[in-house]
């Protein structure tokens, strides 16, 4: 790259990519229903002692603020304020060993996550037993 403008542009893009990745998964994420393609909620992921958890902080218009598939102590519990993602730990740039709760079914699944799209997307996979027996949702970072 002999052109100084090209060099500066390349350096700036490298810095932006590094900053996006440095944020990790902490922050707010808009969930998108993988069946309808519509946004459903905003989840805030926080970190405490290397463990990442996610709590619903906002629902999109038209989404009921009650847990439809919940039973026991979560029956008809409000979704806003509910922790649905627990126990993720960073390992080699990926987030593993967690659990994700599906309010629609009332089931809890094993979970893992990975940043995509320069840190603007989070691929969250919920599964039973082995990862091949699950499904992935792509959440979008809320800025």
Which ranges hold each PLM region?
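Bacterial N-terminal signal peptides that target proteins for export
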Residues: 1-11
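N-terminal signal peptide c-region/cleavage motif recognized by signal peptidases
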Residues: 16-20
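Central antiparallel beta-sheet cores of small beta-barrel/beta-sandwich binding domains
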Residues: 26, 31-111
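Short aromatic-glycine motifs in intrinsically disordered, low-complexity regions
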Residues: 70-76, 123-130
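Exposed beta-sheet edge/beta-hairpin loop segments within beta-rich domains
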Residues: 113-115, 130
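Edge beta-strand at a domain terminus
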Residues: 121, 127-143
């Amino acid at each position: 790259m002999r052109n100084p403008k090209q060099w500066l542009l390349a350096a700036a893009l490298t810095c932006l990519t590094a900053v996006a990745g440095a944020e990790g998964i902490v922050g707010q994420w808009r969930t998108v229903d993988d069946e309808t393609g519509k946004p459903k909620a905003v989840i805030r992921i926080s970190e405490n002692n290397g463990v990442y958890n996610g709590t619903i902080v906002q629902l999109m218009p038209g989404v009921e603020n009650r847990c439809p598939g919940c039973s026991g102590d979560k029956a008809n519990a409000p979704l806003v304020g509910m922790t649905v993602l627990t126990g993720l730990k960073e390992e080699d740039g990926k987030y593993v060993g967690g659990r994700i709760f599906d309010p629609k079914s009332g089931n809890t699944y094993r979970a893992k996550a990975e940043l995509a799209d320069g840190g603007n997307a989070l691929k969250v996979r919920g599964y039973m037993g082995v990862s091949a027996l699950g499904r992935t949702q792509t959440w979008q970072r809320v800025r």
